UniProtKB/Swiss-Prot annotation:
UniProt membrane topology term: Multi-pass membrane protein
GO cellular component terms, A-Z: plasma membrane
Disulfide bonds: none
Record-annotated membrane-spanning stretches: 20-42, 55-75, 105-125, 126-146, 150-172, 176-198, 227-247, 249-269, 280-300
Protein name, as recorded: Protoheme IX farnesyltransferase
Protein's UniProt keywords contain Membrane: yes
Compartments where found: Cell membrane
Gene Ontology MF term list: protoheme IX farnesyltransferase activity
Lineage summary: Bacteria, Bacillati, Bacillota, Bacilli, Bacillales
Alphabetical keyword list: Cell membrane, Heme biosynthesis, Membrane, Transferase, Transmembrane, Transmembrane helix
Similarity remark: Belongs to the UbiA prenyltransferase family. Protoheme IX farnesyltransferase subfamily.
Subunit structure: Interacts with CtaA.
Known pathway: Porphyrin-containing compound metabolism; heme O biosynthesis; heme O from protoheme: step 1/1
Listed EC numbers: 2.5.1.141
Amino acid sequence: MNQIEKTGELTSSRFTVRDFTELVKIGIVNSNTITAFTGMWLAFQLNGISFIQNVDVIFFTIVGSALIVAASGAFNNVIDRDIDGIMERTKNRPTMTGKISGKRALMVALVLGVVGTIMLFMTTWQAGVLGVIGVFLYVVVYSLYAKRKLVSNTVIGSFSGAVPPLIGWFAVEPSFSIVPIMLFLVMFCWQPPHFYAIAIKRKEEYAAAGIPMLPVVKGIERTKKSMFFWVILLTVLPFFMFDLGLVYVILATLLNIGWLALSIYGFKMDDSIKWAKWMFVYSLNYMTILFVAMVVISIFL
């Protein structure tokens, strides 16, 4: 490992758009922004609130959510510089190649976090507080502590990943109902099987980096059982979401049955890595279809 990989020292003043998107983990930003949008959209649709007359709320919610998620990703990159160089999938992050120094990455994270939080508070104080809680859970509780110390790190990290749809809902309708609670639970239960699939594929890398992921500590078979458990929990949730109509409940149930069948097949399949890839791909398609369906179906309610 060279000096750049160890410290992330800046070797070039060039800071490209690609470097920025890698720093903030743009894929995670996009997916979380979609869930925040869905929460916001459903709050408009199910509460009879005008979408057109609240363009400012839409703007502040979407951009604010994207910025705090981006800030969290940048903070995580700064924190993980000591282990990113060990793992194949993270060794080319700009904080490791020297394109972005740790100091600059930290400044970017702080600016994004502050601006994003201010924007969320410009919708409702509930949305702003949820944004702060989400960043704290991901950066402090997960990245600084749980990820490195606890085998339950993935489950703990799922709390922060389930916050964006709550932000979207409470930015529009600052009161509790069953829908935002179910959105939170869908995101919370979806993340363990999704990230455990990655952990199975990257088991040796996590072991080398000293990260106590479930497959590393308890083994792949134990991880398969845990993934099966979380998918079972997902199968229950649609039956608490009849506010979105029977079509949604049927669609979500069919998606859950498919994922459940794939989970069960994993106990019979010898090639666990190949199975984990299938689980990972299914999880991505599952979340995309589910949240797009929520938006589309709600239009006709």
